[in-house]
Amino acid sequence: MKGNQEEYRLKFFLDHDYLRRECKVCKTPFWSKDKTREDCADIPCSDYYFLDMKESNLNWSVSEARRRFLDFFRRNGHEIIPPKPVLARWREDLYLTIASIVDFQPYITSGISPPPANPLVVSQPCIRMDDVDNVGITFGRHLTTFEMGGHHAFNYPDKFLYWKDETVAYAKEFFTKEMGIPEELLNFKESWWEGGGNAGPSFEVTVGGLELATLVFMQYEIRDGEYVPLKLKIVDTGYGIERLAWFTQKTPTAFHAIYGELVDKFLEKLGLPSLNPDMLKVASRFAGRIDPDVPSTIQGHREQVAKAMGLPVKEVSEELTRAARVFQVLDHTKTIALMLGDGLVPSSGGEGYLGRLLIRRALRTLKLLNVDVRLSELVDMQIGFWGKDFTQLVRNRDYILDAVNLEQEKFNEILNRMSSVVSSLTKKKEIGVEDLIQLYDSQGIPPDLMAEEMRSKGLKVEVPHNFYSIVAKRHQSAPVKKEWDTTKLPPEVVKQVKDLPPTEKLYYKDQYARNFEGVIVKSLGKYLVLDRTVFYPEGGGQLGDQGWLLLDGQRVKVVDTQKVGDVVVHVLEREISAKEGDKVKGEIDWVRRFRMMRHHTGTHVVLAAAKKLLGDHVWQAGAEKTPEKARLDITHHRNLTREEVKRIEEMANLVVDDRRPVTPFEINRTEAETKYGVSIYEGGVPNKAVIRLLEIKDWDVESCGGTHVANTADIGGIKIVNVEKIQDGIIRLEYVAGDVISSYAGNLEDKLEGLASKLETSTSQIESRVEKLKEENERMKELIAFYRRQYLDDLEKHVETRNVGKVKIVILPSLKDEDLEREAMRRLTSTQGVVVIHVNQVNGKLQIEIGTSKDLNVSTVVTELVKAGGKGGGRGTFGSVMIEKGTKEEVIDIVERAIKGGNS
């Protein structure tokens, strides 16, 4: 285990004359055939001297590196499997796919489910936001998106495939035979890996300063601080596909190797001059010495580059800053395309928060570059460049670009209100990190764009260099609750039933069953557990069944049904005296249940219709099925139009009319994911090896544990009754099905009758009556406007005024109309040298509003009123003050004194 040298002393190393040495810089042991090597050939112990190596003369693009990697392991007995999306929707605890092993967590790695192949190989696009602030400044060491080439072997006690020696041998074979790297240049640096509750020894494969792969051997579970050997031992490797490309191309930076011609195309689109390749190559060579958490190392790096180039530090610093920002835009736009292409909808929570964060960081970088380019144009260039590798980008192009455009519009609105937000903070002397995070979360304003304006207003503020990384880490994972954390049952009941045998679920054997007989397993007052039941417990957004139980001649109402794990608990309306082993007859409220079955199946139909109409980004964000109606929350970036709602409803009802079979079935989760993809988890991720899917023929397949009709015809029709945006990026659809449509229509008719009565017309004439009332209303508005103008003209002639020097004080009377008072204030202050005061009694206090012409300033008057005991403020030409006690004349006297005492 950790610290045990024998974990790393492999037969392969001994048989192939590798020596175990200790790095003279970091003191980490490593294995190499080079007897003269003194360091581990990894940064910061070594520079990126691979850039000057001549040993490997390949020129792989990222696509070619991926192909070569996959093909090598295919030839060596590994099955190639397709990558999963960058959104980890098969995980409830994680938003983004951060490594290839995530594809198999937690069910395959824990041994609950079999892997899709064994051994296997995958090139998995990954997204990590932990180091987002470091992108660009390390010239390729940090990326938000990268491909992890992973060959994996799952070693079971009865089926052991290969382990450490073979894994290291594969690495040696790949790097020497496929890439042409002399074996003497390979270094296997000893390390230790921990993550997700597992641990194991690992090797980092380094060549010329660049880490090309990590070989992890998951063999322990961390339990109470102890390392407990796992029965399932997993080979978990990560080859950096982009790094393989950079190693072979030896371009000035990793970004040149990854993006090729796109670098110059971006510069052209941004209207920026070409980058200095010689300077960038020197900068990359020394980039390993940069520790972004120590800002002084960045300055030291630039001084080193300047010295090597014989150039002024200022010139080098400006050029490298510009290059880093261009690289940030390159990196972020690809990641944005991948996120949105896999269905992310930018929002203020969950995975959408991370997408919005990256979009806003890209927009902020464009502002810092002082360029006026739509971000969507740059994202579109990424789609064109990567479309063959990631076909979902092309398929979802329209959505991706529309969503990015909408986010840029929102960002511009945010910047427009930045000044007012900063002004509201002037009472604070210092703005801390938590303040900045709160401001970013609530207002969306990038702190580095705010900082300059904050400082100009006397605020002390320091923006952390890793601000976005701090924020991203807080939002990168989701809290996961145990099933019984969300139950409505009392804790003492949960405690007593959670270890009982599973209840036989008759509602799955026959979803149309209404009656049953069972035996009491546990009786806890008004909580009853039976050995079997047709009562469906609340779950998946469907309410628990109600009905009746008959025992000892008593008919007791069941008011709710809940579950704890696989144990179903019947909640009775009153406590009963019953013994374990007693027989019980049960009957569900069938009318109620059947309505929920219709609504539940209808939800699957509506969700699939919305996804087919609006795009792959539509994902279920919540649902509820009650007897009265159903609701479905979906992710979507815009409000739905009336036409879109009508089309979703039409598509759903066509499925109802098609009389499609609705079939529930059980399947191994690995097989289900392979066959149907992770979209089966729209309604949540079940915690089982074998999962229950619901298939609506040729329409939808989704994991679901609810009760459903047997044929879409049984839904009886679907009517969408309400659509609203409930939060940023979430649209709620409410609808009714079957006989509830008739009730809904009846309620509408009652409302129409009531409306007709109020309008003194018939229901058939409501529309024409409303049109007539609208016309009358417009005429009244015109008439009122005419009388307002006349009144104001007359007011200007007769309003009370007082002169103080060259300033005229106008005392505006109460007009009992706020709009009229505002218009009067505007007109009266339109000429120079005017101060208007309006005094109103509000709950025994004096509410004073002051307006001045543009040549005067309201602050002097406001200051005097505050000195006199008032509370309020003002700036420019308007102020407002509240005084507890006083008279109108006293207020006028204060205003006169203020004007006499100085310019108002």
Curated annotation (Swiss-Prot):
Biological processes annotated in GO: alanyl-tRNA aminoacylation
Uppermost EC category: ligase
Record carries keyword Ligase: yes
TM spans (from-to): none
Binding site for Zn(2+): 600, 604, 704, 708
Compartments reported by the entry: Cytoplasm
Keywords from the UniProt entry: Aminoacyl-tRNA synthetase, ATP-binding, Cytoplasm, Ligase, Metal-binding, Nucleotide-binding, Protein biosynthesis, RNA-binding, tRNA-binding, Zinc
Taxonomy, superkingdom: Archaea
Disulfide bonds: none
EC number: 6.1.1.7
Database matches in Pfam families: DHHA1, tRNA-synt_2c, tRNA_SAD
Record bears the keyword Cytoplasm: yes
GO molecular function: alanine-tRNA ligase activity; aminoacyl-tRNA deacylase activity; ATP binding; tRNA binding; zinc ion binding
Domain notes: Consists of three domains; the N-terminal catalytic domain, the editing domain and the C-terminal C-Ala domain. The editing domain removes incorrectly charged amino acids, while the C-Ala domain, along with tRNA(Ala), serves as a bridge to cooperatively bring together the editing and aminoacylation centers thus stimulating deacylation of misacylated tRNAs.
HAMAP family: Ala_tRNA_synth_A
Protein's job: Catalyzes the attachment of alanine to tRNA(Ala) in a two-step reaction: alanine is first activated by ATP to form Ala-AMP and then transferred to the acceptor end of tRNA(Ala). Also edits incorrectly charged Ser-tRNA(Ala) and Gly-tRNA(Ala) via its editing domain.
Protein name listed in UniProt: Alanine--tRNA ligase
Species name: Metallosphaera sedula (strain ATCC 51363 / DSM 5348 / JCM 9185 / NBRC 15509 / TH2)
Biological classification of the source: Archaea, Thermoproteota, Thermoprotei, Sulfolobales, Sulfolobaceae
